[in-house]
């Protein structure tokens, strides 16, 4: 299982590469392989040129893409995201969501997202509305942005 946080949760004293490689250390992946996999994950989200940047040197959208790469690097079958664009402006949110959709499709992953933003829900193939803890509506999205996100 991969997880993309609302507030990025990047380690401020680690580079983008180190942030992405970090979860692999808990799995006992050797250092060289961790770095190779982290570089590939950053390339997959369009941040190959930012791998040595610290979080404070990157925009919010770039930091969120580091978070996406970190979620993908362990090759999970399912990725959960909690308001993944909540801290971003609308243009950056759209850019990040397009990147996420492309990445999810190219890796064949299931992506489940929680959002209060109907613009972000428009990227989903399936939407489940919940009010006061109860499902109020379920529908399949026909919007052009639909991209394999539930």
Language-model features and meaning:
Residues 1-123, 129-130:
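ABC family nucleotide-binding domain
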Residues 126, 134-150:
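Conserved beta-strand-loop-alpha-helix hinge in the C-terminal portion
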């Amino acid at each position: 299982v991969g997880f993309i946080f609302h507030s990025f949760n990047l380690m401020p004293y680690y580079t983008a590469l180190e942030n992405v490689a970090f979860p692999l250390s808990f799995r006992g992946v050797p250092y060289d392989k961790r770095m190779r996999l982290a570089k590939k994950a950053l390339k997959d989200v369009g941040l190959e040129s930012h791998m040595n940047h610290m979080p404070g040197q990157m925009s919010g959208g770039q930091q969120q893409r580091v978070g996406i790469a970190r979620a993908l690097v362990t090759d999970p079958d399912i990725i959960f995201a909690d308001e993944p664009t909540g801290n971003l402006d609308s243009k950056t949110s759209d850019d990040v969501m397009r990147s996420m959709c492309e990445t999810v499709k190219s890796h064949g992953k299931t992506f489940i997202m929680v959002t209060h933003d109907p613009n972000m829900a428009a990227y989903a193939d399936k939407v489940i509305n919940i009010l006061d803890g109860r499902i109020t509506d379920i529908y399949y999205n026909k919007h052009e942005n639909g991209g394999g996100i539930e």
